[in-house]
Design a protein with these regions (language model features):
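A glycine-rich phosphate-binding loop feature that marks nucleotide/adenosyl-phosphate handling sites
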Residues: 65-66, 103-107, 137-142, 244-248
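Short glycine/threonine-rich loop-to-helix capping motif typified by GTGT followed
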Residues: 111-119, 144-153
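Short catalytic/ligand-gating loop segments at beta-alpha or beta-beta junctions
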Residues: 133-138, 181-183
Length: 342
């Protein structure tokens, strides 16, 4: 089990720094000023994770997603001054986190200093840590990085470098009921089991939008049920296709795939009532929810038009010389078009 902790962003630097307290100053924080994790809290969480056999992976995103750093120091991370400061921060971070890995980001940024990433990887390794980096991001050859983390459909595992698959696993893009089906069905990186090149998967909860209560992240994004769905694949392997294949559609009731999901749902609801009792577990049974979905009728931009299904429900419709079918769908969340495609 893994907990990936993204500690720094454009909006704020959320990990306390004793050597550079200005990083946590409210004047350098543009969202939820004054809120950050102390070094003592970070150490306590490391101990908690160890007791529960959870690997904690802290992330200090560099050189992108670093506007908070720039506000505090008036230096870009890739500048000579920025690199000196960052190494001092890495000393503090590596001392605080008694864990084997450190994630250094490297995504969504223009590289202006070709020495920045190799030098930072070497520096973190000199502290006894293995290094993880986003892909797409800096391009590595085998031996130049310890693991990559795929964050986009463009992300590709490289032979000789273990990869973590998070390409389509963004909870903030999910419907609570629809996408759990895709997570459960999905092969990790379209592989039935792990290998030296495919290390596993991580479920991403990016709270890009401002919220008034942190617990709403858990509720609105269906964290716990989706976490169990992806754990089913991470622990057991299998799956029927990749996330963007069958997608969020529950298979027909008479198929083995449907029966397997129904069994998983039953087990998940047991955990809701027992393991997660008292926690916001946003899921109810959906394998008994059935819909009839009619092909789309063109309204030509006229929102007041009335169509045959509004007068009478049928299995097929003939309208203006065209035939419109009806198909059954099962589940509490139905997409007409998904964020990842049709």
């Amino acid at each position: 089990n893994v907990f990936h902790w993204h500690l720094t962003e454009n909006q704020a630097w959320r990990l306390e720094s004793k050597i550079f307290p200005m990083l946590n100053d409210s004047v350098n924080t543009i969202r939820m000023p004054g809120k950050y994790y102390t070094l003592e809290e970070a150490r306590d969480l490391v101990d908690f994770c160890k007791k529960h056999q959870v690997l904690l992976i802290p992330e200090i995103d560099m050189p992108g997603h670093s506007a908070a750093f720039v506000r505090a120091f008036r230096h870009d991370m890739q500048s000579p001054e920025g690199m000196k400061i960052l190494k001092l921060l890495l000393d503090e971070v590596c001392e605080t986190f008694d864990v084997p890995y450190l994630h250094i980001g490297t995504d969504e940024v223009e590289f202006t200093n070709p020495h920045f990433v190799p030098e930072m990887v070497a520096y973190v390794r000199s502290k006894g840590k293995k290094v993880i980096s986003w892909n797409p991001g800096w391009h590595y050859k085998p031996g130049e990085i310890d693991m990559t983390h795929l964050w986009s459909y463009r992300g590709k595992a490289q032979p000789g470098i273990p990869a973590i698959d998070s390409k389509f696993h963004y909870l903030n893009h999910f419907d609570v009921f629809g996408d759990i089906v895709a997570l459960y069905n999905s092969r990790i990186y379209d592989q039935a089991e792990g290998s030296e090149d495919i290390a596993g998967t991580i479920l991403a909860l990016w709270h890009d939008r401002l919220i008034d209560n942190e617990w709403n992240l858990v509720i609105e994004n269906g964290l716990y049920p989706n976490m169990l769905a992806i754990a089913e694949r991470a622990w057991r392997g299998g799956g029927t296709e990749y996330f963007d294949g069958l997608g969020t559609i529950l298979p027909p009731e008479d198929t083995e795939a449907f029966k397997e999901f129904a069994d998983f749902e039953k087990r998940m609801l047991w955990h809701k009532e027992h393991t997660f009792k008292g926690y916001p577990f946003a899921y109810v049974k959906q394998t008994n929810v059935k819909w009839n979905i009619t092909d789309a009728f063109p309204n030509g931009g006229d929102m007041d038009k009335v169509f045959p299904p509004e007068q009478e429900l049928k299995d097929i419709y003939h309208y203006n010389g065209n035939t419109y079918g009806v198909r059954q769908a099962i589940g509490a969340g139905i997409y007409l078009r998904h964020v990842w495609g049709d």
